């Protein structure tokens, strides 16, 4: 892996799959305050083949927002949710279209103190509704609607 990339978290998923989240700073597009942030989630099969790598670049968070969410999957393997969240967000939940609520683990990094990273892999057949960020006290701070992402994914898979 490129030496500028920082591994944020890694783990395993069913079927012998492994995953990792990485991030790195990249030169900005001429902004005076410098760098942009790229973050990705990579899913690897037991033979070491990359099944999926997705995420995004740009500013760590857009002005006025507390979350930047990306989702996706490849032709095989689970569906991935990766979010960059403001440090005020202490807990993240994923809600399915059926109303089931799942905890999305949140990971910090000393290298990227302006954001934390939340990620979860779920079965690709699952229909999702939203990702919600909460304060330490449980107050809902921001909700990201997944309807567009899900409609596109399930129509084109």
Describe the predicted segments one by one.
Residues 76-78, 88-157:
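Ser/Thr-rich low-complexity repeats and stalk/linker segments
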């Amino acid at each position: 892996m490129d030496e500028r990339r920082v591994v944020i978290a890694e783990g395993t998923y069913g079927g012998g799959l492994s995953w990792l989240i990485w991030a790195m700073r990249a030169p900005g597009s001429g902004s005076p305050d410098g760098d942009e942030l790229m973050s990705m989630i990579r899913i690897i099969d037991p033979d070491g083949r990359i099944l999926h790598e997705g995420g995004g670049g740009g500013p760590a968070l857009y002005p006025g927002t507390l979350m930047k969410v990306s989702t996706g999957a490849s032709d095989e393997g689970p569906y991935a949710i990766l979010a960059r969240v403001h440090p005020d967000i202490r807990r993240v939940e994923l809600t399915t279209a059926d109303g089931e609520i799942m905890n999305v683990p949140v990971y910090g990094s000393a290298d990227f103190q302006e954001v934390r990273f939340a990620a979860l892999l779920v079965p690709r057949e699952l229909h999702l509704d939203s990702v919600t960020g909460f304060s330490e006290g449980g107050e809902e701070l921001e909700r990201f609607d997944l309807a567009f992402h899900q409609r596109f994914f399930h129509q084109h898979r």
